[in-house]
């Protein structure tokens, strides 16, 4: 391996940590200072926030306790405030509580109401000025410039086909540019002197006139406030507040930086409002474009899009809260007596608390953390979304926004993005990328000096803008020992085009071939041999792999597994040099000492270990110690493995013996055939922990009670409950079993008349309660692993109205079974179609049965050949007893490097004793395989190897579902849909066509009536089935009645008529009321349901 794979990546969740740090150190203070001072309407009272001295109190609970109690992990913010009474000169100082601020955990997450959440980074258009070229229908070019602030009114300048310059304020009607320039107080000379082409601008003056400053202000007021009497002072005030008032208009630091850069100004970084010079320079640049001077902007270029991370999003939300707070403070100052006022009585923390709660609880960017496995967690924190407040919407986003842009190179991964409506709107940060102070994404490069790569110097981080004018070579170009680039011509990127140049011309070289892709994609070995669409699926499916009972790291990896595991926060990492003094399943203790002198000891550090915790996705979080007592440890060493890691490396799946061969059609269409060994040996067994919760509330009729005394339940059903009616830990439960017994008081109205009679006779003996116990849902079973009880008496915080909350955790071991989804790392996914006994599986010449048979037809059309390389290299590795780390993009070691490497290693493996059958020169990579049922060899050699296969979280147990009778929708009275609602399968329009084509009249009639929404009919049908009678004729479906009512509401008289024979044989017309169900007769049709006895028939006729 070269130095490429050993280059350690930067801390992968730095983007979260750094942003939150910035918020605590600068962002929060900045906001508090911008609102200080707040004065009342008369100006005699002033309230100052002393933002830089704000304090955070210790959190009430630590991280684990917050999760246990369903609380938020947050701190109280206190700000020193000063109230000054201008009339009396009195000054009052006080520390005021302004709200709770959720704290970021070490892993870059927040704990809100006991659930771990992640704030996703948002990518938005950067404030600044943008120039755009448009062609009208006659093919004439016109240009427009948009001045976009961080907050405030947009300003748009445009030229029309006659070469006149106009301006629009906030998308209103257009004004002559001269009106705006004169209104902001510029003289004619100042305007014309600062333009490069005053003669072009003169046309606008000739056509639109040249107003004085007063006329311009009146004109402006007319356009912006039509219908109000225009005044000069009104125009002045309007203009001031729109563009020159820091409260209403803010370019932001970034906006000022972009504006200075584009228009070559040198305004100070602190000038956050527009200046007349900005507007003049913007118009000048626009006019220059007409003369082909300057460039138009590409809004999808990453130089024009910036990332807003946690800190900034939170700062914006705090601004919203402080805005509301400011209004309240002003009102209180005005209303109250000034002597009695104190800062604490003025400042009400509610609006700020609400704003922060709203942001963390319901913002589109605050997401429930995907915790399926460590990789999913890491990727979620590095996600970049264009959606959310201030961003795009799915419907409005066109193709250009979603597409890969040349400036994404090394910044945003071109591969990892969702499939479906969000494709391209949600991306992932590339492995080496970082976000700079302005929010632009940077990526590192090594300097090249006269053809020599300076790897001895620190890499330089460049933004997309800076990189555009450089000649940048990729990270996989061959170099010699000194770092001189080998070869005459080097492929480079220059100004977003690919070309070649001589080594001396190259300015920079990429740090590593992996730097252009994201962490998940960089876990795919032989990525360069896979089609991008399949690599995308592979990246996304690794995030859905379930942590298995016995994790096993891949035989063929990429070398980044260890860092991904470490940065995900799932493993425990030593912070110091030291000696392990104690290890058990719950904690590791380390006695630190100085690296040079072991005698200098520090205070003992205790690392707690998580055991069998439930993750957000119901998978199991469990850590296992890797060190032993007395072992020396160094900083950064992994002390304990987490879920889906082994030896401190990511281990999402298992290495299993795979053959690419069809077997009796069981792997048709991507289905997968597996061996029973994977079930028996628990190769793909995972643990899932589910949480069930019940609360005893205070009702109008009295409190609900958690108890063992449940009406109408036998002792057998209660055998596992303790004296309080709560299940004991360790009990095995199946669907329908009681977990927590609960009874609810029943009102008089709920009681049937016979019960009222009994109560009247026997007095208050029978307790009027209803069984409301928590039971195990349908299709679930498992063992109770934990029970937590929270009560008011113990001082726990409970939801309003609840007296007691009980949580039960049920764990189940799920072996792999037919219907589960499996996948490789190359987007090769499939559903298990059959589990064969070991003796029937095809076997190798040494008698080993295959573990899994995949369809060879899944490879050619999908073009993910990487799986074949992986499978063969794994085969060589297994026979040689070694693991491989293969960095993607290996062509720098020569043409066809992957193929040569694999070929050479397979040959080497076949030279080991008794391994000559492993490799056959005549058909390399293929082996003779025998049929397990007959012992005959298959008629041609088969590709066999070790593949790393994952079991995905889409488990059949969670999806399988059946319904006989169940709930119905309130309005349409049709059965509900979906497993969660205990719903039915929708027999849709096209399915009905199929039955109509067969003429299956009775099935159709039942589908549309008794099985769906004929209310009376379905009850009668059920009774008839239960009693074994024939099913009566159906009535009118509810949906038809709804249609009738809708037509009647339109004034249409809809009625059904039938022809009846009267006594004298005349036929008469009678209207039928479809809204009421008349008495039904049994249908005159063959009865399949039951054989009638004579008594039955007599009963029916009555």
Swiss-Prot record:
SUPFAM superfamilies: beta and beta-prime subunits of DNA dependent RNA-polymerase. One of its GO terms (biological process) is DNA-templated transcription. Its EC number is 2.7.7.6. It comes from the Bacteria. Pfam families: RNA_pol_Rpb2_1 (PF04563), RNA_pol_Rpb2_2 (PF04561), RNA_pol_Rpb2_3 (PF04565), RNA_pol_Rpb2_45 (PF10385), RNA_pol_Rpb2_6 (PF00562), RNA_pol_Rpb2_7 (PF04560). It catalyses: RNA(n) + a ribonucleoside 5'-triphosphate = RNA(n+1) + diphosphate. GO terms for molecular function: DNA binding; DNA-directed RNA polymerase activity; ribonucleoside binding. Keywords: DNA-directed RNA polymerase, Nucleotidyltransferase, Transcription, Transferase. GO terms for cellular component: DNA-directed RNA polymerase complex. Residues 1076-1102 are annotated as: Disordered. It is an enzyme of class 2 (transferase). Coiled coil: none annotated. In cyanobacteria the RNAP catalytic core is composed of 2 alpha, 1 beta, 1 beta', 1 gamma and 1 omega subunit. When a sigma factor is associated with the core the holoenzyme is formed, which can initiate transcription. DNA-dependent RNA polymerase catalyzes the transcription of DNA into RNA using the four ribonucleoside triphosphates as substrates. Belongs to the RNA polymerase beta chain family. This is DNA-directed RNA polymerase subunit beta. It comes from Synechocystis sp. (strain ATCC 27184 / PCC 6803 / Kazusa). The lineage of its organism: Bacteria, Bacillati, Cyanobacteriota, Cyanophyceae, Synechococcales. The gene is rpoB.
């Amino acid at each position: 391996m070269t130095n490429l794979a050993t280059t350690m990546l930067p801390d992968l969740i730095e983007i979260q940590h750094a942003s939150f740090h910035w918020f605590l150190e600068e962002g929060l203070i900045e906001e508090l200072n911008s609102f200080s001072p707040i004065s009342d309407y008369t100006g005699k009272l002033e309230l100052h926030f002393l933002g830089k001295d704000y304090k955070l109190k210790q959190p009430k609970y630590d991280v684990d306790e917050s999760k246990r109690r369903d609380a938020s992990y947050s701190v109280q913010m206190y700000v020193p405030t000063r109230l000054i009474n201008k009339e009396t000169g009195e000054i009052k100082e006080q520390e005021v509580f302004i709200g709770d601020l959720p704290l970021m955990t070490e892993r870059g997450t927040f704990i809100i109401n006991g659930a771990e959440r992640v704030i996703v980074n948002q990518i938005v258009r950067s404030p600044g000025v943008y120039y755009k070229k448009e062609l009208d229908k006659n093919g004439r070019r016109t240009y427009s410039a948009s001045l976009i602030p961080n907050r405030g009114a947009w300003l748009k300048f445009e030229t029309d086909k006659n070469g006149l310059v106009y301006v629009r304020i906030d998308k209103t009607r257009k004004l002559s540019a001269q009106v705006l320039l004169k209104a902001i107080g510029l003289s004619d000379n100042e305007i014309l002197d600062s333009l490069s082409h005053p003669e072009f601008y003169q046309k606008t003056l000739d056509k639109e006139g040249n107003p004085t400053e007063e006329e311009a202000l009146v004109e402006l007021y007319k356009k912006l406030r039509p219908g109000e009497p225009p005044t000069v002072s009104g125009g002045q005030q309007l203009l001031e507040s729109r563009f020159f008032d820091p409260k209403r208009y803010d370019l932001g630091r970034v906006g000022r930086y972009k504006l200075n850069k584009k228009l070559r100004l040198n305004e100070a970084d602190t000038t956050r409002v527009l200046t007349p010079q900005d507007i003049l320079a913007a118009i000048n640049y626009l006019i220059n474009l007409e003369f082909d001077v300057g460039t138009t902007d590409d809004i999808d270029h990453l130089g024009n899009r910036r990332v807003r991370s946690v800190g900034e999003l939170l700062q914006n939300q705090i601004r919203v809260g402080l805005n509301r707070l400011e209004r309240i403070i002003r009102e209180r100052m005005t209303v109250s007596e000034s002597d009695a006022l104190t800062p604490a009585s003025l400042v009400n923390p509610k609006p700020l608390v609400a704003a922060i709660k709203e942001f963390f609880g319901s913002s589109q960017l605050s997401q429930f953390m995907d915790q399926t496995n460590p990789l999913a967690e890491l990727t979620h924190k590095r996600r970049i979304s264009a959606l959310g407040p201030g961003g795009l919407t799915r419907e409005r986003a066109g193709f250009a926004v979603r597409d890969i842009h040349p400036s994404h190179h090394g910044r945003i991964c071109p591969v990892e993005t969702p499939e479906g409506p969000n494709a391209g709107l949600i991306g992932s940060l590339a492995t080496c990328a970082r976000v700079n102070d302005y929010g632009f994404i940077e990526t590192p490069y090594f300097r090249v000096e006269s053809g020599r790569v300076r790897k001895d110097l620190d890499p330089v981080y460049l933004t997309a803008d800076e990189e555009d004018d450089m000649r940048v070579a990729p990270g996989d170009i061959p170099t010699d020992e000194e770092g001189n680039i080998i070869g005459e011509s080097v492929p480079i990127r220059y100004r977003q085009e690919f070309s070649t140049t001589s080594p001396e011309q190259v300015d920079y070289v990429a740090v590593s071939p992996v730097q252009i892709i994201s962490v998940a994609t960089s876990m795919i070995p032989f990525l360069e041999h896979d089609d991008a669409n399949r690599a995308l699926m592979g990246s996304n499916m690794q995030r859905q792999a379930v942590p298995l009972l016995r994790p096993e790291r891949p035989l063929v990896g990429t070398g980044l597994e260890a860092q991904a595991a470490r940065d995900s926060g799932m493993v425990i990492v030593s912070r110091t040099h030291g000696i392990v003094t104690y290890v058990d399943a719950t904690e590791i203790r380390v006695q630190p000492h100085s690296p040079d002198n072991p005698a200098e000891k520090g205070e003992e550090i205790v690392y707690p270990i998580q055991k069998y915790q439930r993750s957000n996705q119901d998978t199991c979080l469990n850590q296992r110690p890797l060190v032993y007592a007395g072992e020396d440890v160094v900083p950064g060493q992994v002390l304990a493995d987490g879920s889906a890691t082994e030896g401190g490396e990511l281990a999402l799946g298992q290495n299993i013996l795979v053959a690419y061969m069809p077997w009796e059609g069981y792997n048709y269409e991507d289905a997968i055939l597996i061996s029973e060994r994977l079930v028996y040996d628990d190769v793909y067994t995972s643990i899932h922990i589910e949480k069930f919760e019940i609360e005893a509330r205070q009702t109008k009729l009295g409190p609900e009670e958690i108890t063992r005394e449940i009406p109408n339940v036998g002792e057998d059903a209660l055998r596992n409950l303790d004296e309080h009616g709560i299940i004991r830990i360790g009990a095995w439960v199946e669907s329908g079993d009681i977990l927590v017994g609960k009874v609810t008081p029943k009102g008089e109205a709920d009681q049937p008349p016979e019960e009222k009679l009994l109560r009247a006779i026997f007095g208050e003996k029978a307790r009027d309660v209803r069984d409301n116990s928590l039971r195990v849902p349908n299709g679930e079973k498992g063992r109770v692993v934990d029970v937590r009880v929270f009560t008011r008496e113990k001082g726990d915080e409970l939801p309003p109205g609840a007296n007691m909350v009980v949580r039960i955790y049920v764990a189940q071991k799920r072996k792999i079974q037919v219907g589960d989804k499996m996948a490789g790392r190359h987007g090769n996914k499939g559903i298990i179609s059959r589990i064969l006994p070991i003796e029937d599986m095809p076997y190798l010449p040494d008698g080993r049965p295959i573990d899994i048979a995949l369809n060879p037809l899944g490879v050619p059309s999908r073009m993910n050949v990487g799986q074949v390389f992986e499978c063969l290299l794994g085969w060589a590795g297994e026979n040689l007893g070694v693991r491989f780390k293969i960095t993607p993009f290996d062509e720098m070691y020569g043409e066809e490097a992957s193929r040569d490497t694999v070929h050479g290693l397979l040959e080497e493996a076949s030279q080991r004793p008794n391994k000559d059958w492993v490799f056959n020169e005549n058909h390399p990579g293929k082996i003779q395989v025998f049929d397990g049922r007959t012992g005959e060899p298959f008629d041609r050699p088969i590709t066999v190897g070790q593949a790393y296969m994952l079991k995905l979280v889409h488990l059949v147990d969670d999806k399988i579902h059946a319904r006989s009778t169940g709930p119905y929708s309130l309005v349409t009275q049709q059965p509900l849909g979906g497993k969660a609602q205990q719903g039915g399968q929708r027999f849709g329009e096209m399915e009905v066509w199929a039955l109509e084509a067969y003429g299956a009249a009775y099935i159709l009639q039942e589908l549309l009536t008794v099985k769906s929404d004929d209310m009376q009919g379905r009850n009668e049908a059920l009774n008839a089935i239960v009693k074994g009678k024939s099913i009566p004729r159906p009535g009118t479906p509810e949906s038809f009645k709804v249609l009738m009512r809708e037509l009647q509401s339109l004034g249409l008289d809809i009625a059904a008529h039938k022809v009846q024979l009267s006594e004298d044989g005349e036929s008469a017309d009678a209207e039928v009321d479809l809204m009421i169900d008349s008495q039904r007769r049994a249908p005159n049709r063959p009865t399949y349901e039951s054989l009638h006895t004579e008594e039955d028939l007599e009963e029916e006729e009555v």
